[in-house]
């Protein structure tokens, strides 16, 4: 109705300049889509099957399908009663041609010797000559209308069902197979237990086959062809049989094959997967021959640091009046960093490191502290709406009630949490605090460029910066928070009713946590939440909300309030060999703060808790690792979350991206790791492409022999502990040579990055189930896993020879480098 009104009485729009300002424009009506919807609704197709670009082609294609469906109904299912309405409509054009005169007819009835007679009028059709042309014209005018009406009333099944049957014939052995095996149920709407709308039938295919009937073998051959097309030709090994089995179960789930039939079809289909056409086995033997994989010994390669080629200034109007960024260039005295790589590893991914220079430091501060990029332009980070964090106060209240009132640690108690270099640093800070109390100057930031492995596949990313405060400040704040971190994590778990904060667990424990979370749901789906530069988006309001947790544990503590307020108004300096940078920033999480990890946990959990309460969804499970989150829900809630989550977080000042959902446990990615089943249960395994490319690079200076030995030992011990019983990656870490540890050696964590989760140890073997689960997680088939392991067996490290050049031969991992 609104469309008709707009066509009859169009609104007059006022245009100012090139664009209309302050004028509400109505969306244009797509006549093509409107006609398609009207026609398809009348034709009862059940869905809009619009695959063409022109209206003429669309109508022609629709009529062809409609005619074929009606002809099939007439040839196979015709009944007299189905066509009564159509025949009645077809006789309407004949009615104007006839003239109906009446004649008297006497009817006599006799009963008990008496006779009763009466006259009745009987119509007598005839074709009179008078007015014949006029009657003929009326009949001809009605003929096309009645023909269309008669065609429209001809019986047929739904076009969506007919199309499904037609497609099925292309994949079955013959038409009888498609007709007998495929039964499409009519659509019916149901209500779920939670009141949600469910649609059953309509597009659902069921395979109906009785025991002993010959339809199972052709169907088994067909799904075997589909499985080989998806996975490829694999050798007949236990792990590859499991891989084929998983693919075919997914196909039969989609086809709704009865479980009694799967018991017979599955062994037949798995056997068909290993029946190869002529020439396939010979080609596979040539592909996997040892002569085609000539691997050289792995020597140490030194790669120089890089300087960003991008130089961007902060646009005017972005900085607040109290914010400043001053750059002072000095003499060109910048020194190059180095990154060391072990050559010969079967991965083409390469990593570099940013130099500690003025150009890198400036870009890191501009793009990772002050500005975000939106539509190719630098702008200020989004700010939360007024009162947005106030709506999250029920979560904070629930957590603080579980924690209760805390007591501040003494200096010795705080120092007991540290060892090594950090212990020495904080010990000197404590000695200084005994002489001079903490002051606002201790909260000032010292900024430098992070020595991080940067993938060459990312182009020229903005360098990351580290912004620690004075150790004196960290000691005073740590006395309030360091011992309460685990208690706050447990309190958050208590509010959610399950393990939510994934911190302090082994890789095996985290894998089992995900297994338990997944089993809670009937039809689970996992959604990854990617917070773009979470630390940078922490506004003053977000930090104040976080500080409310700490203030509630220490009510009325003035020193704590003063320490926390200094985090809201940041002052920092960055010293590099070729210049200095001085800046002031309101809000923003500083990466060197002692409460960075704890604060990110609390903020993310609070926002997810408030969001799910906002939607009214009670069945969900959250795995949180700071700014990296995975949300597991029932599939019926997926669309609701995908459509509303980014806007909700934007109102809180965060740019949140909803990653594509996954429907298998192994496909869940959490902190660049996937759950993988192995002999001991479930384990979180780092992405194989990331692990085998990053862990052959080292950003520390390992030029001296003792440090090289310590680094190799750390890679071997740490990697094997994390990957015992896992295909490929266990073999990879075992190739790092073990050396005798000298009496005075560097600690492991000083020469290599600390692993995300500790290893639980244990001596496990690689099982077929582990290979199948590894394939589901990373897409490497059993044959590809064995080929990689064979290549790693022939990879020999030489960390003490002369520095070589980067040499690489193609491998399976190069197809999708992370």
From Swiss-Prot:
It is an enzyme of class 2 (transferase). GO terms for molecular function: nucleotide binding; RNA binding; RNA-directed RNA polymerase activity. InterPro entries: DNA/RNA_pol_sf, Rev_trsase/Diguanyl_cyclase, RNA-dir_pol_PSvirus, RNA_pol_HCV, Tombusvirus_p33. Its EC number is 2.7.7.48. GO terms for biological process: viral RNA genome replication. The keyword Nucleus does not apply. SUPFAM superfamilies: DNA/RNA polymerases. RNA-dependent RNA polymerase that plays an essential role in the virus replication. Belongs to the tombusviridae RNA polymerase family. This is RNA-directed RNA polymerase. It comes from Cucumber necrosis virus (CNV).
């Amino acid at each position: 109705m609104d469309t008709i009104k707009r066509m009859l009485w169009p609104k007059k729009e006022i245009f100012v300049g090139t664009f209309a300002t302050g004028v509400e424009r109505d969306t244009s009506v797509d006549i093509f889509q409107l006609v398609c919807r009207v026609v398809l609704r009348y034709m009862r197709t059940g869905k809009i099957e619009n695959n063409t670009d022109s209206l003429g082609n669309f109508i022609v294609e629709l009529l062809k399908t409609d005619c074929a469906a009606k002809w099939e109904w007439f040839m196979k299912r015709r009944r007299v009663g189905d066509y009564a309405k159509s025949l009645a409509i077809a006789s309407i054009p004949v009615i104007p041609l006839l003239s109906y005169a009446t004649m008297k007819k006497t009817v006599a009835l006799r009963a008990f010797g008496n006779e009763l007679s009466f006259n009745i009028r009987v119509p007598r059709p005839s074709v009179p000559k008078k007015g014949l042309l006029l009657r003929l014209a009326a009949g001809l005018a009605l003929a096309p209308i009645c023909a269309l009406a008669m065609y429209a009333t001809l019986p047929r099944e739904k076009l969506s069902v007919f199309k499904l049957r037609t497609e099925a014939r292309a994949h079955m052995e013959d038409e009888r197979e498609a007709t007998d095996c495929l039964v499409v149920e009519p659509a019916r709407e149901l209500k779920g237990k939670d009141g949600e709308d469910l649609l059953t039938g309509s597009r659902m295919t069921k395979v109906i086959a009785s025991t002993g009937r010959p339809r199972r073998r052709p169907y088994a051959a067909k799904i075997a062809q589909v499985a080989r097309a998806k996975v490829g030709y694999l050798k007949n090994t236990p792990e590859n049989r499991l891989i084929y089995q998983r693919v075919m179960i997914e196909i039969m789930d989609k086809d709704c094959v009865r479980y009694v039939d799967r018991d017979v079809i599955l062994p037949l289909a798995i056997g068909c997967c290993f029946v190869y056409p002529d020439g396939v086995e010979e080609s596979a033997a040539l592909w996997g021959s040892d002569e085609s994989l000539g691997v050289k010994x792995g020597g140490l390669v030194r790669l120089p640091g890089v300087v960003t080629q991008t130089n961007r200034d902060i646009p005017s109007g972005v900085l607040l009046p109290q914010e400043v960024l001053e750059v002072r260039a000095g003499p060109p005295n910048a020194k190059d960093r180095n990154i060391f790589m072990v050559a010969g590893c079967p991965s083409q991914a390469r990593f570099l490191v940013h130099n500690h220079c003025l150009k890198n430091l400036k870009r890191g501060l501009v793009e990772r502290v002050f500005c975000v990029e939106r539509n190719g332009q630098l702008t200020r980070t989004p700010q939360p709406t007024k009162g947005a964090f106030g709506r999250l106060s029920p979560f904070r209240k629930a957590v603080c009630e579980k924690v209760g009132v805390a007591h501040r640690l003494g200096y010795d108690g705080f120092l007991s949490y540290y060892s090594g270099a950090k212990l020495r640093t904080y010990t000197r800070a404590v000695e200084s605090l005994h002489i001079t109390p903490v002051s606002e100057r201790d909260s000032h930031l010292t900024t430098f460029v992070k020595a991080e492995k940067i993938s060459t596949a990312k182009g020229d990313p903005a360098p990351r910066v580290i912004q620690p405060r004075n150790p004196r400040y960290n000691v005073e704040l740590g006395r309030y928070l360091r011992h309460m971190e685990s208690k706050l994590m447990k309190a958050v778990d208590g509010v959610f009713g399950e393990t939510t904060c994934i911190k302090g667990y082994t890789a095996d424990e985290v894998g089992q946590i995900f297994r338990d979370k997944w089993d809670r749901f009937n039809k689970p789906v996992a959604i990854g939440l990617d917070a773009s530069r979470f630390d940078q988006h922490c506004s003053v309001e977000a930090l104040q909300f976080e500080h409310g947790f700490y203030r509630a544990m220490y009510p009325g503590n003035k020193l704590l309030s003063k320490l926390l307020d200094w985090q809201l108004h940041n002052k920092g300096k960055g010293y590099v060999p070729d210049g200095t940078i001085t800046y002031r920033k309101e809000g923003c999480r500083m990466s060197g703060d002692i409460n960075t990890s704890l604060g990110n946990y609390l903020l993310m959990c609070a926002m997810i808790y408030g969001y799910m309460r906002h939607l009214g969804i009670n069945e969900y499970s959250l795995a949180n690792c700071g700014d990296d989150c995975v949300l597991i829900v029932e599939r019926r809630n997926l669309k609701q979350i995908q459509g509303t989550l980014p806007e909700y977080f934007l109102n809180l000042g965060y740019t949140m991206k909803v990653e594509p959902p996954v429907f298998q446990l192994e496909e869940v990615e959490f902190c660049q790791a996937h759950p993988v089943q192995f002999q001991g249960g479930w384990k979180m395994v780092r992405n194989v492409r990331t692990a085998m490319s990053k862990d052959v690079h080292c950003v520390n200076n390992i030029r001296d022999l003792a440090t090289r030995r310590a680094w190799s030992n750390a890679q071997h011990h740490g990697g094997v502990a994390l990957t015992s019983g896992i295909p490929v990656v266990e073999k990879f870490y075992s190739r790092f040579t073990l050396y005798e540890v000298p009496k005075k050696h560097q600690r492991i964590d000083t020469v290599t990055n600390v692993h995300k989760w500790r290893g639980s140890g244990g001596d496990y073997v690689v099982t077929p189930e582990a290979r199948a689960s590894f394939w589901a997680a990373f897409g490497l088939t059993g044959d590809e896993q064995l080929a990689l392991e064979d290549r790693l067996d022939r990879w020999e490290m030489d960390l003490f020879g002369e520095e070589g050049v980067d040499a690489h031969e193609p491998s399976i991992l190069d197809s999708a480098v992370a």
